[in-house]
């Protein structure tokens, strides 16, 4: 039984990481092709995606699939990557 829980924990972390990567890719495409970071549509998409990921993390935490610190680390890492992407985008324009 313990092995099954460990497998689910690892699977949960991997799925959350995939979702974070998907958000980063979505924002990158949006910055490259569609809008400027100051655009309300850009901010709305980013806020919505980050909120959705935070709810997924909260759900996984409540189920005991991940530790709260793992969730915080995932959000923090994504925020840093998005910030670097934003800075890169602004330096190109």
UniProtKB/Swiss-Prot annotation:
It comes from the Bacteria. Gene3D superfamilies: SO2669-like. Pfam families: DUF1507 (PF07408). InterPro entries: UPF0358, UPF0358_sf. Belongs to the UPF0358 family. NCBIfam families: PRK13666.1. This is UPF0358 protein lin1058. The lineage of its organism: Bacteria, Bacillati, Bacillota, Bacilli, Bacillales.
């Amino acid at each position: 039984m313990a092995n099954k829980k460990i497998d689910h924990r690892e699977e949960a972390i991997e799925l959350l990481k995939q979702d974070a990567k998907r958000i980063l890719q979505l924002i990158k495409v949006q910055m490259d092709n569609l809008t400027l970071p100051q655009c309300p549509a850009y901010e709305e998409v980013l806020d919505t995606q980050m909120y959705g990921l935070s709810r997924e993390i909260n759900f996984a935490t409540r189920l005991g699939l991940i530790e709260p610190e793992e969730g915080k680390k995932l959000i923090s890492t994504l925020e840093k990557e998005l910030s670097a992407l934003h800075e890169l985008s602004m330096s190109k324009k």
